[in-house]
C-alpha cells in the first residue's frame, strides 16, 4: 500500500506525521524505523501517529516513535506539529485540542499564526517516578561520569525523563561525548534525555539536548520545559523564560510546583507525500 504522510518540523526537530484515522495503517517499531531512516526512508527525528482515542474525553491519541523505532512517552515539539496537522487534515476544526499520550493528557491551543501553546502538565519531580536512582527528592543530584567526573544535574520528568546539566557555554559543551554517557547512565533505569543549559539571564537560557534514542536534535520541547523547571528549582530563573535552541526559540512558563508547564512555539509544514510500505 501507499502511505500518505506529511513532513513537519518544530524549530528543526523534524517529524513524519501519519494520519492513522482516515487511512488503515498500523505503525510498528520496525515500520517507524524504516520511515525515519534518512538514507532509505523519508527521514526524521520522530514518527508521530494520530489515532482514535481510547477515552471519549480526548480528541485524539498521540503516539511517538523515535528514530531508532523505540516508542516514547512525550514530545513537546511534536505536540505542536500534531495540533496543526490534525487541523490541516480536516480531522478537527477545534482550536483547543485534547490528546491522549502514554502518560496522560495534553491540551493544545492553536493560535491564528500557527503558533501553538501546549499545556505540558505539571513536572514530575519524585525520583521514583522520573525514574532516577536517588534516596530522596532534591533540587539537584550528583552524577558520577567517566567523561567529566562528578557532575551536578537537575532531574525532571515531563512525561519523559530529563537530566539538566548547567554549562558555561552551550557552544563548547561536550554534548557529543557526555550526552551519550548521561543518556545511558545506570542511575536512570529507563535512560534519559541529557540537556546542556547555559543561563544567559534569569529570563533567558541557551540549551542543547542529546535526546534518548535520537541523539542531539535541533530542538527539544520537553527538554526546554525540563530545563526551565530545573533552573527555577535551583533559583536561577524567572517564571517565564526564552529558551534558545539550535533550531530557534521557545517561550516556557512555569509558576511553580503543581502548576502546569506552558510551552509556546511554531509548527511548520514542509511537504506532503506518499511512500510505499
Curated annotation (Swiss-Prot):
Keyword field: Amino-acid biosynthesis, Cytoplasm, Isomerase, Lysine biosynthesis
Cellular component per GO, a single term: cytosol
Tree of life domain: Bacteria
SUPFAM superfamilies found in the cross-reference section: Diaminopimelate epimerase-like
EC id: 5.1.1.7
Entry's Gene Ontology BP terms: lysine biosynthetic process via diaminopimelate
Residues at the site labelled Important for dimerization: 271
Reaction it catalyzes: (2S,6S)-2,6-diaminopimelate = meso-2,6-diaminopimelate
Catalytic center residues: 75 (proton donor), 220 (proton acceptor)
Annotated PROSITE patterns: DAP_EPIMERASE (PS01326)
Assembly behavior: Homodimer.
Its job: Catalyzes the stereoinversion of LL-2,6-diaminopimelate (L,L-DAP) to meso-diaminopimelate (meso-DAP), a precursor of L-lysine and an essential component of the bacterial peptidoglycan.
Homology family: Belongs to the diaminopimelate epimerase family.
NCBIfam families named in the record: DapF
Protein name in the entry: Diaminopimelate epimerase
Taxonomic source organism: Saccharophagus degradans (strain 2-40 / ATCC 43961 / DSM 17024)
Native organism taxonomy: Bacteria, Pseudomonadati, Pseudomonadota, Gammaproteobacteria, Cellvibrionales
